[in-house]
Amino acid sequence: MKLLMLCREPRLYSCQRLKEAAKHQGHEMDILDPNHCFLKLSQNPPHFQIFYQENSESKPYLLPDYDAVLPRFGTTSTQMGCSVLQHFEGKGTFCLNSSQAFLNARDKWKSLQLLLKAGVPVPNSLFSGGEVQAHATIPHISSPTILKTLNGSQGIGVILAEKPQSAVSIMEAFKQTNISMLQQDFIEEAGNADIRCFVMGDQVVATMQRIGQNGEFRANCHRGGKTEKITLSDEEKQIAIQATKAIGLDVAGVDLIRSKNGLLVLEVNASPGLEMIEKTSGIDIAAEIIDYIEINAFINSR
């Protein structure tokens, strides 16, 4: 197969592992930055064309047809990356995670709405319009409070407000810069730990527990969190699979937290990193992803 990965940083561990796995299984993979693409729509065939410009001095060239596309772009490239994905979808190419599912996952508030609508348990959450005064929301959420920007990643844009007045001050400051935030219950009984599940289709292929270090409430590995193996019950695995389906994703990293009221889904990531979960679980997730693409690209082509 001829595969394409959409990624701004081809040297990242996840990108390199996927390229190695594809090569090992006899496939060719290109890695291209979606921000170097330009898209053409035409009434006459071919209706969907994608051109690529390597640099400011080079002449754009028409991209060939691919058997499958793997989106691995970050939050700053969401708009263009999803536009490129939509173009490939228009061409009938199999995309591992659709453009709409990617957009669902990248909007934290929309994803919470989709999760709860599908019956997936999530923390109590609030999102308010720009004309709502921050102090008016405080009686409706517990304290301490978690504050999150709508499209952050790797723990960036996540703040713990210990007291109600702190939450008000932080929200008012962010409002001045036109940055919207959602409020969420802080699950104190979980301490500084959460769980990352790697879901592929109808299966949880790997899990790990992440533990924040040195008083850091965020357990993200990018924030220095430690990881260790963890075993989930069948019920907990089903919640992770259900969350992935609710967002519309084929492959996802689902973040879970154990509360006194049961398991809660914190977030569903459309482009989860492979490094720490592969090293912690000992599972070759990159190879599993290529296997999944082989099967589903074949089904898509029939």
Curated annotation (Swiss-Prot):
- The disulfide bonds in this chain are none
Query: Is Disulfide bond among the key words of this record?
Result: no
An individual GO BP term: protein modification process
Q: What lineage is on file?
A: Bacteria, Pseudomonadati, Pseudomonadota, Gammaproteobacteria, Pasteurellales
Sites binding ATP sit at K148, D185, F186, D194, R218, A219, N220
Record's cofactor remark: Binds 2 magnesium or manganese ions per subunit.
An MF annotation (GO) of this entry: metal ion binding
Q: Which cofactor does it need?
A: Mg(2+); Mn(2+)
Q: Where does Mg(2+) 2 bind?
A: E267, N269
Tell me which GO cellular component terms the UniProt record holds.
Answer: cytoplasm
EC category name: ligase
Annotated signal sequence is none
Give the record's keywords alphabetically: ATP-binding, Ligase, Magnesium, Manganese, Metal-binding, Nucleotide-binding, Protein biosynthesis
EC numbers, comma separated: 6.3.2.-
Similarity remark: Belongs to the RimK family.
Q: ATP-grasp domain: which residues? A: 112-294
Binding locations of Mn(2+) 1: D255, E267
Q: Does the keyword ATP-binding apply?
A: yes
The record's section on Pfam families has: RimK, Rimk_N
Species of provenance: Haemophilus influenzae (strain PittGG)
Sorted alphabetically, which NCBIfam families does this protein's record hold?
rimK_fam
Q: Which residues fall in a coiled-coil region?
A: none
Annotated Mg(2+) 1 binding lies at D255, E267
- What is this protein's name? Probable alpha-L-glutamate ligase
Write down the Gene3D superfamilies for this protein, in alphabetical order: 3.40.50.20, ATP-grasp fold, A domain, ATP-grasp fold, B domain
Sites where the protein binds Mn(2+) 2: E267, N269
Source domain of life is Bacteria
Q: Which InterPro entries does the protein's record reference? A: ATP-grasp (IPR011761), ATP-grasp_RimK-type (IPR013651), ATP_grasp_subdomain_1 (IPR013815), RimK (IPR023533), Rimk_N (IPR041107), Rp_bS6_RimK/Lys_biosynth_LsyX (IPR004666)
